[in-house]
Each structure stands twice: as C-alpha cells, then as structure tokens.
Amino acid sequence: MAIGKRLKKAREGVDRTKLYPLDEAVKMVKERATSKFDETIEVALNLGVDPRHADQMVRGVVMLPNGTGRTLRVGVFARGAKADEAKAAGADVVGAEDLVEQVQGGNINFDRCIATPDMMPLVGRLGKVLGPRGMMPNPKIGTVTMDVAGAVKGAKGGSVEFRVEKAGIVQAGVGKASFTEEKLVENIKALADAVTKAKPTGAKGTYIQRVAVSSSMGPGVKVEPGSIH
C-alpha cells in the first residue's frame, strides 16, 4: 500500500480536534502502526518556553522504565582505567586522540557520546561536528562524568536525552509499536515527569501546553495534557 493511502486509512477514526486520554491515544497509535517494520512511538510536548532565552532552556536525561526498544551505539572518550571500564560496560567505541581524529574525519560510529572531564579540552575540538547532531557530551545530562560505566549502562539500558527545540517543542522516542500499551504509557509518563522537573526558572504560565503521540509512519493523536502525569 502506498504511504499516502496507508496514512489516509490510518487517519480514519482520529478526531484531529479532540484531546484523548493518554491510554486511549496510545491504543489508537498502536492500532495504526501497520508498517512492515517495528515503528518507533514518539511523543511531542509543546512547552510554554522560548529557548532563545538562556533562562528558558529545557534539557535533561531520563531513564525510561521499559527501555526504548532500540540498541544505541555508545562512544566514550577516555584513557587508561576509565577506558577499560567503558569497554567492560559495553561501550562500542572507546578512544582518545585516535577517536577525535576519526570523528574529525567524519567517521562517527556511535549514537551517544560520553567523555571523562579530563578529555573535554580534546573533545571540545569536535563541537562543530557533534554539536549539530546533539551529541556533544554535557555534564548537565551526565555524559561528562567519571562514572563512565554507569553512563554507558544507562545509555544502553534506555536513557533518553531530551532538549527543547526552537519552537518550544521536546520530541522523543519512547518505545516501539511492539511494546504493550502499559509499557508505552509508563515510558511517556516518565518522560513527562522528567521534562516537568527540568522546568526552567524563566518559564511563565502553562508549562506543558500541548501533547501529541504518533508512530514513525502514522498520524499524530492529540493528548489531554493532564493525563500524562
């Protein structure tokens, strides 16, 4: 079936003017995830912030209770014993100057990047490469740390980084269509709680204004904001 026809069929029964309770919205999205691959379930939170102002930036990391259903490749910048710890914890790529050279050459074989604090002067050279990809290590979200083993295990185990975009939206994958409705709801609530805890001091008025759930190839379903906590 052509994508256009599939999407048109999937939109049937979805009232685009209605706000659905979270559990009902998740059920509808799962029922409409009919692609041959296991679609990712995504959440978009429209926040009452303007990220152009430093005191309204929202970012953080959350450990989803049921994982993401996706296996992340993790790269670690570390030396010596910390490099050994990273490897033992399951990091896919570990290095120092050699890894910096690889990344500078466009060879990025990881999805999440972690670094020990002493490596940051070196990793800082990669800002133009890693920054636009949202992969620059940052102590605020636990990716610049001496506990490289914990960070690697977290990334592999279902931790999700989130950051508000220019339009004031936080988007994140919260699982797969093959997950049960209950597991998806738990993951979405964990994300919403983490975003709420990350509320910046400069945020005024209603913080979480609009919520939508969708699958990779399916329509968005609007959610009652009050049902996500």
UniProtKB/Swiss-Prot annotation:
InterPro entries the record matches: Ribosom_uL1_bac-type, Ribosomal_uL1, Ribosomal_uL1-like, Ribosomal_uL1/biogenesis, Ribosomal_uL1_3-a/b-sand, Ribosomal_uL1_CS
Q: Which domain of life is it from?
A: Bacteria
Entry-linked PANTHER family: 54S RIBOSOMAL PROTEIN L1, MITOCHONDRIAL, LARGE RIBOSOMAL SUBUNIT PROTEIN UL1M
UniProt function note? Binds directly to 23S rRNA. The L1 stalk is quite mobile in the ribosome, and is involved in E site tRNA release. Protein L1 is also a translational repressor protein, it controls the translation of the L11 operon by binding to its mRNA.
Q: One Pfam annotation, family name?
A: Ribosomal_L1
Which PROSITE patterns does the protein's record reference?
RIBOSOMAL_L1 (PS01199)
Alphabetical UniProt keywords = Repressor, Ribonucleoprotein, Ribosomal protein, RNA-binding, rRNA-binding, Translation regulation, tRNA-binding
Q: Record's Gene Ontology CC terms? A: cytosolic large ribosomal subunit
Q: What is this protein called?
A: Large ribosomal subunit protein uL1
Which NCBIfam families does the record associate with it? Answer: rplA_bact
Q: Which GO terms describe its biological process?
A: regulation of translation; translation
- Molecular function (Gene Ontology), one example: structural constituent of ribosome
Q: Which organism is it from?
A: Rhodopseudomonas palustris (strain BisB5)
Q: Relate the assembly described in the record.
A: Part of the 50S ribosomal subunit.
Give the similarity note: Belongs to the universal ribosomal protein uL1 family.
Report if keyword Ribonucleoprotein is assigned: yes
